[in-house]
Amino acid sequence: MKVKIEESWKEVLNNEFNKEYFKKLVKFIKHEYKTKNGKIFPPPKLIFNAFNSLPFKDIKVVIIGQDPYHGKNQANGLAFSVDSKIKIPPSLQNIFKEIEKSLKIKTIPNGDLKRWAIQGVFLINTILTVEEGKPSSHKAIGWEIFTDEVIKIISKNLKNIVFMLWGNLARSKKGLIDPTKHLILETSHPSPYSANNGFLGSNHFSSALDYLKKHNKNIINFQ
């Protein structure tokens, strides 16, 4: 089936788009957008924003989130990201805090992470849609099957990618990644409830830049 997505992704995911589970997923999601009167996030055109912001072969870092923010006007299709006019959520505040400490730089007070995506950071949630005010409302409808396959395809077809796995859900994806080809960084989720259990002080961002330099890749400006 036809999916509006960046051409290089269309090529690597075409088989997935034609599987029965994905067809059922699309049918369900279309019905949700049609019947829930603007209460499904992100807007339809932004569901695949992570893919459309970054060609497949340009990926350098993968950050795995959970499901989109469920507040109005927050989710923009990039994990942990919000539109520039929206207040920066607590988890992203902690991400910026860790960047400033780890890299000794000042971050831009802007929650739109498109600036990272265009440099090679693939910001993928395990679930790509959500109903307003209902976290995990689109769990187990097919998105996890799809995003697991995306992670496996990245691991198999690319090399020397940094995978940042924050929190139990993201860390459960470790088995999908080939540790002989990639750098896997694990710690707690940046949420205020768990950031002090390892995320703050993890130095993931400095480790990522060191790894990219080691493998002769252009480093990322995480400001």
From Swiss-Prot:
Residues of the active site are D67 (proton acceptor)
Compartments it resides in:
Cytoplasm
What are the EC numbers?
A: 3.2.2.27
| Gene Ontology CC terms, in alphabetical order | cytoplasm
Q: Which InterPro entries does the entry mention?
A: UDG_fam1 (IPR002043), Ura-DNA_Glyclase_AS (IPR018085), Uracil-DNA_glycosylase-like (IPR005122), Uracil-DNA_glycosylase-like_sf (IPR036895)
Q: What GO molecular function annotations does the UniProt record carry, in alphabetical order? A: uracil DNA N-glycosylase activity
| Entry keyword set | Cytoplasm, DNA damage, DNA repair, Hydrolase
Pfam families attached to this UniProt entry: UDG (PF03167)
Q: Which CDD domains match?
A: UDG-F1-like
| Catalytic activity from the UniProt record | Hydrolyzes single-stranded DNA or mismatched double-stranded DNA and polynucleotides, releasing free uracil
Enzyme type, top EC level: hydrolase
Q: What does this protein do?
A: Excises uracil residues from the DNA which can arise as a result of misincorporation of dUMP residues by DNA polymerase or due to deamination of cytosine.
Family the entry assigns = Belongs to the uracil-DNA glycosylase (UDG) superfamily. UNG family.
Which NCBIfam families does the entry link to?
PRK05254.1-1, PRK05254.1-2, PRK05254.1-4, PRK05254.1-5, ung
Under which name does UniProt file this protein? Uracil-DNA glycosylase
